[in-house]
């Protein structure tokens, strides 16, 4: 079947595509994978700061920077690599875990702690935090700025049209 507006999975991918394009950065599958990586990295860093877990020593500043850069420089090709792993594992969150282990294997500190990536977590732990970050980021960067523009325009129109008489209406009827 050809890819067109009529064969889109939903109207959001079809006729409304141009209207929701700014949200793609926050709600695409790529975005979900990126947020999963962010959550897994944050969890691993938190474990390294936990003195009660002797098996994971506190990471050096260089290692923390490497982990942060993995998140900030996450690319489409990284996402595609995770999808290739997922094709083998049939598990989306496990694929992120395996990708992190492979990608960070050259770091001695992380290699020693590799089995603690995803430690004591369920997939839902990772997913619900990822979805929360998706919502938070989209609100901050797309939705609230758009609402601010709407409010500004309404205030402008209210001042501009304050002296214009209008017929009162109830349910669209005069």
Please tell me what each predicted stretch does.
Residues 1-174:
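A helix-coil-helix interface module used to build multimeric assemblies
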């Amino acid at each position: 079947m050809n890819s067109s507006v009529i064969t889109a999975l939903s109207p959001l991918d079809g006729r409304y595509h141009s209207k929701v394009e700014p949200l793609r950065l926050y709600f695409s599958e790529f975005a979900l994978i990126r947020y999963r990586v962010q959550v897994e990295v944050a969890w691993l860093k938190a474990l390294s700061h936990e003195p009660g877990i002797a098996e994971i020593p506190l990471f050096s500043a260089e290692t923390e920077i490497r982990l942060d850069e993995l998140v900030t420089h996450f690319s489409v090709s990284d996402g595609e690599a995770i999808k290739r792993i997922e094709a083998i594992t049939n598990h989306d969150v496990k694929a992120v875990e395996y990708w992190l282990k492979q990608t960070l294997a050259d770091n001695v500190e992380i290699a020693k702690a590799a089995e603690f990536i995803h430690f004591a977590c369920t997939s839902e732990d990772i997913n619900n935090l990822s979805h929360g970050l998706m919502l938070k980021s989209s609100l901050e960067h797309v939705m609230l700025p758009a609402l601010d523009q709407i409010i500004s325009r309404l205030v402008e129109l209210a001042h501009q049209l304050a002296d214009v008489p209008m017929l009162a209406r109830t349910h669209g009827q005069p």
